[in-house]
A protein has these predicted regions:
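Beta-strand-rich binding/interaction modules
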Residues: 187-200
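Aromatic- and carboxylate-lined catalytic core of secreted/periplasmic carbohydrate-active enzymes
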Residues: 119-160, 198
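Conserved alpha/beta catalytic core and glycan-binding cleft of carbohydrate-active enzymes
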Residues: 1-110, 116, 148, 152-190
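Active-site-proximal helix/loop capping residues that flank conserved catalytic or ligand/cofactor
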Residues: 35, 74, 81, 134, ...
Length: 200
């Protein structure tokens, strides 16, 4: 959240991202998550809303996407994959953040006239194939299947293979799985080389 709030895309440092998600003792079990419920409460913004902002309301219908929605969806997936693939204990999704729920949560209180209007989650959004929410939901299911279906995944170390903050790329390996991330907002790479274990 801090990186998204305080830095433009061009200033994101992959080495810092990897450090933040792996900064723990090897034997220390943790619960990893991209955002806490605090971001979903009224007065703050979720990751997806910080990335896409009001375009979530106007350009989340299939065929009507724009650059902001496509970028936000891609970054949301990458942030969640990085967080989930570096776990050492557990991964937490909650209250619709796995599919980019568009609204905040506001429980009945004096300040909102004791309204229940935003004390809900619209689970139907992820099932509507005419909207982009299902892209995030489908990705989340595939990601969880990969991590959960990989034998002894959490017993493997996160081994950094490469990072280049100038290119905004990094790679790490867990067992037989190799994860490569390009966080550059302006550059794609072909035949990008880095060292891996023999046989990878």
């Amino acid at each position: 959240i801090k990186t998204i709030k305080e830095k433009i895309d061009e200033d994101w440092k992959p080495s810092s991202m990897l450090w933040e998600t792996t900064n723990r003792r090897a034997d220390e079990k943790t619960i990893s998550y991209c955002e806490s419920h605090d971001q979903a409460l009224v007065g703050d913004k979720t990751i997806i809303f910080r990335l896409v902002d009001a375009d979530m309301y106007w350009h989340f219908k299939k065929g009507d996407e724009n650059f902001a929605t496509e970028r936000g969806i891609a970054l949301h997936k990458m942030i969640r994959l990085l967080t989930c693939s570096t776990i050492n204990g557990g991964y937490l999704n909650f209250m619709g953040n796995e599919f980019g729920h568009p609204e905040w949560i506001d429980f009945p209180r004096e300040g909102n006239g004791w309204s229940h209007k935003y004390a809900r989650r619209q689970w139907n959004l992820v099932d509507n194939k005419d909207l982009c929410y299902h892209y995030l939901g489908d990705f989340d299911q595939a990601m969880m299947s990969l991590i959960g279906g990989t034998k002894n995944f959490q017993k493997t170390k996160v081994e950094e293979r490469w990072h280049n903050d100038g290119d905004q790329v990094f790679a790490f390996q867990r067992g037989e799985l190799l994860f490569f991330f390009n966080f550059s907002p302006t550059r794609s790479y072909t035949d990008y080389g880095f060292m891996v274990k023999a046989g990878t």
